[in-house]
């Protein structure tokens, strides 16, 4: 059981290291934060008044993260 946990821990560290080296953490975190801030503003605005219109806020947030964040 200990060997299995060690293997998963090592794999997790490797994946984290690869992710960290491929994208600067500060930029990625700031980008995600900016997208989420826009999402919250969209939900609080008058354009979010029913399920379908509020869903557009989610769509815009997803697009922001997928296309704008490295």
UniProtKB/Swiss-Prot annotation:
The highest taxon in the source lineage is Eukaryota
Its tissue distribution reads: Expressed by acrorhagi.
Q: Name one GO cellular component term.
A: extracellular region
What species was this sequence derived from? Actinia equina
Compartments, record wording: Secreted; Nematocyst
Q: Hey, which family's this protein in?
A: Belongs to the Acrorhagin I family.
Misc. comment: This toxin interacts with divalent metal ions (zinc and nickel). This suggests it may function as a metal ion chelator to regulate metal ion levels or as a metal ion transporter, or that its function is modulated by metal ions.
List, in alphabetical order, the Gene Ontology terms for molecular function in this entry.
metal ion binding; toxin activity
Q: What does the protein in this record do?
A: Toxin that is lethal to crab. It interacts with divalent metal ions (zinc and nickel) suggesting it may function as a metal ion chelator to regulate metal ion levels or as a metal ion transporter, or that its function is modulated by metal ions. Is not active against any of the voltage-gated potassium and sodium channels tested. In addition, it does not show activity in bacterial and fungal growth inhibitory assays as well as in hemolytic assays.
Keyword set, alphabetical order: Disulfide bond, Metal-binding, Nematocyst, Secreted, Signal, Toxin
Q: What is known of its domains?
A: Has the structural arrangement of two alpha-helices stabilized by disulfide bonds (CSalpha/alpha 4(S-S)).
What is this protein's record name? U-actitoxin-Aeq5a
> Listed disulfide bonds for this chain?
31-69, 35-64, 42-57, 48-54
Cite the source lineage: Eukaryota, Metazoa, Cnidaria, Anthozoa, Hexacorallia
Q: Which residues form the signal peptide?
A: 1-20
């Amino acid at each position: 059981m200990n060997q299995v946990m060690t293997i998963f821990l090592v794999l997790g560290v490797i994946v984290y290291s690869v992710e960290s080296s491929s994208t600067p953490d500060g930029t990625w975190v700031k980008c995600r934060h900016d997208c989420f801030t826009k999402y919250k503003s969209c939900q609080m605005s008058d354009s979010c008044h029913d399920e379908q219109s509020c869903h557009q806020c989610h769509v815009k947030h997803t697009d922001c993260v997928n296309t704008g964040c490295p």
